[in-house]
Regions:
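Glycine/threonine-rich flexible loop motifs
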Residues: 62-73
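Class I S-adenosylmethionine-dependent transferase superfamily signal
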Residues: 4, 80-84, 111
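Short glycine-dipeptide loop
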Residues: 10-11, 87-93
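S-adenosyl-L-methionine
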Residues: 10-13, 17-63
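Short strand-turn motif at the edge of the Rossmann-like AdoMet-binding core
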Residues: 19-20, 58-59, 95-100, 123-125
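Conserved SAM-binding loop of SAM-dependent methyltransferases across substrates and taxa
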Residues: 1-10
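A short glycine-rich, Lys/Arg-flanked "PGG" loop and its adjoining helix->strand segment in the class I
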Residues: 72-90
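Class I S-adenosyl-L-methionine
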Residues: 100-141
Length: 141
């Protein structure tokens, strides 16, 4: 949230949601503590009409069973993508974390239908053996 605030500047809005409390408040950001599945679109938007960018760093509590973890990650990603599809302004962008697995290509194709540009991104900071990657979409239509 702090990074996003630096990008949007004093005239932008940053809204975050997490199940865990923030260690300390972040001035200029609006934080909702809760589960994304139990949070309404209206609660996320607040006074805003739409978002220009939706970022999702959600990851499931891992079990160590790769197929289970990948399926849970895909479900969280699809929830975030669904929110983006409902809440993004035209030409908006979405970036979400997902574990690589059998659902990845289907989800990438879904994004390609709604965004003019879709990329797979593995951050340099991510361990080489990590299965987490990010899907980024620009130009929401």
């Amino acid at each position: 949230m702090q990074y996003a605030l630096g990008v949007v500047g004093p005239h932008g809005a940053v809204v975050g949601i997490d199940r865990d409390p923030l260690p300390q408040p972040i001035p200029g950001a609006r934080f909702l503590r809760g589960d994304i599945y139990a949070t309404t679109d209206a609660e996320l938007l607040g006074e805003l009409k739409a978002f220009d960018v939706v970022l999702s760093d959600m990851a499931p509590d891992t079990t160590g069973v790769r197929a289970t973890d990948q399926a849970r990650s895909a479900a969280l990603f699809e929830e975030a993508l669904g929110r983006a599809e409902r809440l993004l302004a035209p030409t908006g962008s979405f970036v979400g974390k997902i574990f690589q697995g059998p659902d990845l290509e289907k989800i990438r194709k879904r994004m390609a239908e709604r965004f003019s540009e879709v990329k797979l991104v593995k951050p340099d900071s991510s361990r080489a053996q990590s299965i987490e990657i990010f899907l980024a979409g620009k130009g929401f239509q």
